């Protein structure tokens, strides 16, 4: 087993996002995909590790950046501020989820029928 990772940049509504993609390089065929959503801290090292663990199970896994530009925070005050800003904008939630989904769906290793 050889887990590979890649920072995956994508754009939604003119905002740059930095997802974290992981897959088992020893598998050659397309595989099902999983979106890994972070806690309110953002796409931090813990979520990246969980993304890699899901890849070990045979999935193409994408750690999702919900805040943009790969932002992470350390305090509940910062986390609450970023999370509330996203939650207040239903359009932002929908388009950010769709953007991450499309990254996974369009990846060459993805079995787009099993996401």
Question: Predicted regions: what is each one?
Answer:
Residues 7-110:
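Serine-hydrolase catalytic machinery in alpha/beta-hydrolase-like enzymes
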Residues 111-115:
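Short, intrinsically disordered, charge-balanced linker/junction segments flanking boundaries
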Residues 1-3:
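Short solvent-exposed loop/turn micro-motifs enriched in small/polar/acidic residues
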């Amino acid at each position: 087993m050889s887990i590979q990772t890649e920072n995956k940049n994508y754009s939604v509504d003119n905002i740059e996002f930095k997802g974290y993609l992981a897959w088992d390089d020893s598998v050659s065929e397309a595989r099902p995909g999983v979106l890994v959503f972070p806690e309110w801290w953002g796409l931090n090292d813990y979520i990246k590790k969980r993304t890699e663990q899901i890849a070990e199970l045979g999935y193409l896994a994408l750690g999702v950046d919900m805040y943009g530009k790969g932002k992470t925070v350390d305090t509940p005050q910062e986390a609450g501020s970023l999370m509330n800003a996203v939650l207040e904008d239903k359009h932002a939630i929908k388009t950010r989820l769709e953007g991450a989904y499309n990254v996974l769906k369009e990846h060459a290793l993805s079995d787009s029928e099993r996401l």
